Amino acid sequence: MKNEIIQSALRNLKIKELNPMQKASLEQAAGRKDVILLSPTGSGKTLAYLLPLLLTLKPNDDSVQVLILVPSRELALQIDSVFKAMGTPWKTCCCYGGHPIAEEKKSIVGNHPAIIIGTPGRITDHLSKGNFNPETIETLIIDEFDKSLEFGFHDEMAEIITQLPGLKKRILLSATDAEEIPEFTGLNRTVKLDFLSDASEEQGARLKLMKVLSPSKDKIDTLYNLLCTLGSSSSIVFCNHRDAVDRVHQLLADKKLSAERFHGGMEQPDRERALYKFRNGSCHVLISTDLAARGLDIPEVGHIVHYHLPVNEEAFTHRN
């Protein structure tokens, strides 16, 4: 019966075969051990932990059974969308900043979700208000763990764990081997699945790096000419700051080059609209901070342009 649930979910997602990382995770994450899964952004980690949940979620149970912590609103919504597309009987609720907390509470109380997906700050708010019972949660998943640390969510995540007395299992997913990982596992024996080295070799074979030299005063002109050369191929242009995204977007607009911008200072509907247009191909250029590098499912990106160099190797890994 349980295998039928997995097969049905895969059919609904139109996925014929899992990749090696997903197969390994399905085997280990459904067991009793804690799991650390190290794999690059965009490698399919979402399925790697959602599928095993189908083997452990209790049917006909109105309590919250699983908590998934993520660093961004977009990732929360993406995970929610994937789970809903599986066509299972269990319900979910997304909780994140910028969304009315009263609506989230109403959804939790009225819909009885088995899974709550949220950012650490908003989950902390719900717990402080007693909006759901944390004692029934048996599985904690932290996706994009390294990015959550980078965002300064260490203390919130640690505090949330102290409020989950019924916790039986933890799953941590990260695109880098962050040194803080052991702090958040160890509830049970821990299995570490490391697919970073394999993916690094694959990425090295897949990526072609090109350096474009330009004086600072000509940088926008150089970017404009490069994007014109790339034509209709989809491109993400990464900047290190929100104001830089806005400035580059406006300067390209002045040159009649159509692009969307994407950063954490934008209103949520505007961010969702920008991602939607980029994903469906109606816009070929997305100018973004590293927010677009945080586990978002953006298929078939042809080119990554580092308008500003990434601040460290981890940022480079996430962007690419």
PLM segments and residue spans:
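Conserved helicase RecA-like core
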Residues: 1-320
